[in-house]
Swiss-Prot record:
Native source species: Paraburkholderia xenovorans (strain LB400)
Functional note: Cell division factor that enhances FtsZ-ring assembly. Directly interacts with FtsZ and promotes bundling of FtsZ protofilaments, with a reduction in FtsZ GTPase activity.
Any one biological process term the GO annotation gives: division septum assembly
Gene3D superfamilies given in the database record: YacF-like, YacF-like domains
Similarity comment: family membership: Belongs to the ZapD family.
Keyword flag Cell division: yes
Known partners and oligomeric status: Interacts with FtsZ.
Alphabetized PANTHER family for the sequence: CELL DIVISION PROTEIN ZAPD
Cytoplasm as UniProt keyword: yes
Lineage, opening ranks: Bacteria, Pseudomonadati, Pseudomonadota, Betaproteobacteria, Burkholderiales
Keywords: Cell cycle, Cell division, Cytoplasm, Septation
Protein name: Cell division protein ZapD
Amino acid sequence: MILYEYPFNERIRTLLRLEDLFERFTFFLTQEDAREHHVALTTLFEISEVAGRADLKSDLMKELERQRQTLAPFRGNPGIEQNALEAVLGEIEQTLSGLSQMQGKTGQHLADNEWLASIRSRAIIPGGTCKFDLPSYYAWQQLHPDQRRQDIAKWVTPLLPLRDAATIVLRLARESGQASKVMAMQGSYQQMLSGRSYQLMQVRVAPELRVIPEASANKYMLWVRFTVQDGDLRPRAVDVDVPFQLTLCSL
C-alpha cells in the first residue's frame, strides 16, 4: 500500500516537513560522493529554516510534557506493558532534557559561521556554488568522505533534539489511529468528524490502482478526491469507485 499523509494543522505540517528533511539529510550524509554531501549540506540549511520558527521548540516541549503527564499515571497498571511504557517515558524525558539545553535562536550557529553563511547565500543561486565561486568550498569537497561527514554531523548536532521531539510526537499521533476500509464512490469520499479534533489523516491505496488522493478538511468534515495522471502527468478526476484505507490520528 502507498501511504499519503495530510496534516490538519500548522504544527503537524511543520513536523512532517522536518521529518522529510531529516530523512533526506540522513540519506545523503551516509553516501560517499561530494555532490551527495552537497545535497546533505543544503538540506541542513532547509532544516534550519523550518526549525527556526519562533515557537517550534516551546510547542514541542509543551506537547511532550503533556504526553508525559498523560502516560505517567499508567505506571504500575497491570493492563499496560510496563517495559514499553518506561521506554516511551524515558525517551520523552531524555528528549525534553535535550530541548531544554538548546540555547539561543535555533540554527544561529549556522548563521554565525561565515564560511557556511557564504555557501548558504550562494546555494540559492542556480549554479552558484561552482568551484570558481567558492574555491574554499571546492577544497572542502576534496576531503575524505569521513572528514566531510564529521563536519556536517557537527553542524547538525545542535538541531537533533528537535528531530527527536518531532519523531516522538509524530509516532504517538500515528499510533493513535486505527485504519478502516472505505470506498470513494466515483472517486470521491467525505466523512463527518462529529466535532472530534484530529491532527493527521492517513490514506493508503493499492499501488496497482495508480490513483492519487487529494484531501481537505475542516473541524466538521473531511473530503478525499482521487485523481489519475494522464500522459503529461496532469491530474484528471477519477469517475470509478476507489477502495482505500483511512486512518484519523489524534494526540
